[in-house]
Amino acid sequence: MRPDASAPALLVEADGGSVVMDPRRTYHVGRDPAGEVVLHDARVSWHHAVLRTDHGHWLLEDEHSTNGTYANGRRVEHCDVGPGSVIRFGNPTDGPCAVLSGAPTPRTDAPRPSAVSYPAATRTFRQPSSVRPLPRAARTTRIGRAPGNDLVVDDLAVSRRHAELLAGPDGYEIVDLGSHNGTYLNGQPVARAAVVPGDIIGIGHSAFALVGEELQEFIDTGEVSLDVQDLAVHVDRGRKTLLDGVSFPVAEKSLLAVVGPSGAGKSTLLNALTGLKPADHGAVLYDGRDLYRDYAELRQRIGLVPQDDILHSQLTVHRALGYAARLRFPEDTAKAERQARVDEVIGELGLAQRATQPIHSLSGGQRKRVSVALELLTKPSLLFLDEPTSGLDPGMDRSVMHMLRGLADDGRTVIVVTHSVLSLDVCDRLLVLAPGGRIAYYGPPEEALRFFGFTQWPEAFEAFEADSVRDWAGQYRASPLHRRYIAGDSRQPRHAPEAPRGPVAAPKAQSWGGQLRTLMRRYAAALSADRTFLIIMVALPFVMGAMAHALAGRSLTRDSALNALLILCVGAVLTGAANAVRELVKERTIYQRERAVGLSRSAYLMSKVLVLGAVTVVQAVVLTMVGLFGVRLNAPAGAGVLMPPLVEITLAVALLAFTAMMLGLFVSALVRKEEVTMPLLVLLAIVQVVFCGALLKLSGTPGLEQLSWLVPSRWALGAMAGTIDLHRIVPQGLTADPLFQHRPGIWLLDMAMLIVLSLVLGFLVTRLLRRREPEIMRK
């Protein structure tokens, strides 16, 4: 049964603290620290009773407790309660007591945390969810998710041991205990900082403020407003305007659609509202708080579903969401807790029957639901979607929009950027952007066409493009609709422009090692589920090895040695580069979103390097063994430079394949479209053949020689040629290369240069990945 919001709010005082009970919520009473009203008495059951609303009044229900629940002196199973009710738990005379009274009426002039930009307009800070006294005898108040804390916060975004509030002679200090998502003071991450009255301590979805000797808790339940004020974005040194003075309010629990012709600034507005690319001028107020100023904290409460899927399509729905939960929740979150949350969002979005299916096998609408489920894991208050119905048929379009309507009704603010006008009627508000990034309309969807003077949306969009002289924005500003829906609905005063914002600190992430392990498991699972990729990975080294073996014959001779080594080089380059050349560009959207919520750049890259590196090295070993097994190598005295000849050649091929893999990652990070990777792979192979030293005389040729130093196959062929002393077997000018000498120093130089090239490529990939990150956090 859903709670009844028409019932009055009540204040319950129990166990030395007080809680204002919101009629839209259910309150659990018992010894369970995760409950809303916690009683520390052995006579009280773990789950003792429930307080909830029903048909406009409050209802007390006993949950089959051992020692009973007593209202006004008599034992009850369930009964109506209200202001003046006295409830005892566990014993009718001296059991823990809860007294109910009417909640104090919020006063607009009541003190609010000073770090809120506009306290009078905020909903979260209008009334504390709970008030807890801070006894001076206890100098440390421990805050976290674990039951043993002094202040238990039932939120998976909160670590089990999250923070401590320390009382000292000079006041209070907040100390972060190495939490997953961080502790924030007035929106900024802190490790240790002094707290004064009016400051906001942010922990998960909760905010705490000191008021005298009390700690007031304010919970962000998701019902938050958004106020957009005078956003402007300019490019080309101010010569071109993408957004021009965009202002509008978005109420709690509402669904807003943003439409407009191409080039009207829809994507620019989305980036500005989410904080990914802040506007050059103006402000975005999240429930009275400056989003850009407090972005480090508030970004955890923002969900963004891009147009492209943000999950690995080879994985099943349940498995993909499970890996996402491991990355987004604290490392100390129990597996059962994560799985419970995954199952909850799967059920909420109607995906229970599809949970074991691979994502790529789902319909477009179902895949979009999975992407939404990913964002709902962390219970965001604001949910943004970019073109969620793109490519869907009208039925699926309608289904997705009704899903978003339901998400808003459940207590979220949902903003969707779309080109589809089929289901605008389910939205509360519609924002129409005209070319130049100006507001042509904001208000109820049903009034939009009448305001423009058209009967169909295609006519309106054609007019936007054709009638460029018409002042669409000016007409709207002069209309009664602007006064009613923008000037009238906006509850927050104009926000003064602040100084330009620099990059914020990177999100406080799960431990680097924990992220790396999760990323490696997920990547290995995705690779193993891609059957086509597996077949290619297995077949390629055998095919190239067989070609090398056919050329080598039974022995490396004057006629076969150079060609056999060349084929090994080509095979290693193709194997390594083919493994990696698509891996970063195809995950561009996934990386951008995960980086924004705390993914470590280096852990992400290292997961690719380690998993692909292991696969590539195994392939290189197979390639060499197939190519040279049983072949007489004709090394001097049957020995290599430092080790047996076959071992040295295998090491050279493996290191070349690894370096080629790093080169493939570099190309994948460099390009913007997956389609161009295959032509570039062919080009890479040609360059390796030309500059390896097997076809052209490079030593002593100005320009070509220096250019060849950047080509991995040049050094790998040198190492292999040195192992067998190729100039001795093939005595010609081409093999009289200084890098082909059978000397330990030369062989080690060849191998060392492959390592150096790998490291340089890794550094370059890291810098290129930085380009894909949200602009506000690049550093």
Give the ranges of each region predicted by the language model.
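Helix-to-loop junction immediately C-terminal to a conserved catalytic motif
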Residues: 274
